[in-house]
Amino acid sequence: MADYSFDIVSKVDTNLIEESISVALKEITNRYDFKDSNSSMELNTKDNEIKLSSADDFKVKSLYDILLTRLSKRGISLKNFQPGKIESALGGTAKQSVKIQQGIPADKAKEIVRIIKDAKIKVNASIQGDQLRVTSKSKDDLQATMALLKGKDLGLDLQFTNYR
């Protein structure tokens, strides 16, 4: 009998983030409360972060709220975004960086494997870099594992791919 498997990943589509940022920037240019505030949002794909800057702390918080609204309207889970502290910058401005979590960190991967083993479902879970591979002889066991993980709040948006 053949083995069946699927992968557990946690990825955010950077194209959707770019589109959300451009829509948010258009909204900012049209809003009266952001007039003459030199507000900006920049996506840094190398560091997986979004940099927000504006005239003061309140406007940076508003920028973050606008960004989250636009991301959620695109269907992007907000679990993978961790905001940093709002810092004062030169010229009386304020800035904030928002980290984008791509992949499953090692500690979360170990936690997921432990949850699967504690459930006593007949599956094997193995960590492969920033994703997990779950294998079993039964498709029903794999579906039970998916349902188990969907029911848990792990602080990450998990996607199930490569179902074979």
Curated annotation (Swiss-Prot):
Tell me yes or no: is S-adenosyl-L-methionine among this UniProt entry's keywords: no
- Annotated GO MF terms: nucleotide binding
Q: A Pfam family this protein belongs to?
A: DUF520
SUPFAM superfamilies linked: YajQ-like
Keywords from the UniProt entry: Nucleotide-binding
Residues of the signal sequence? Answer: none
| CDD domains xref list | YajQ_like
Q: Which GO terms describe its cellular component?
A: cytosol
PANTHER family (alphabetical):
UPF0234 PROTEIN YAJQ (PTHR30476:SF0)
Report the function annotation for this chain: Nucleotide-binding protein.
Give the record's family classification. Belongs to the YajQ family.
Record protein name field: Nucleotide-binding protein Emin_0136
Organism, by scientific name, is Elusimicrobium minutum (strain Pei191)
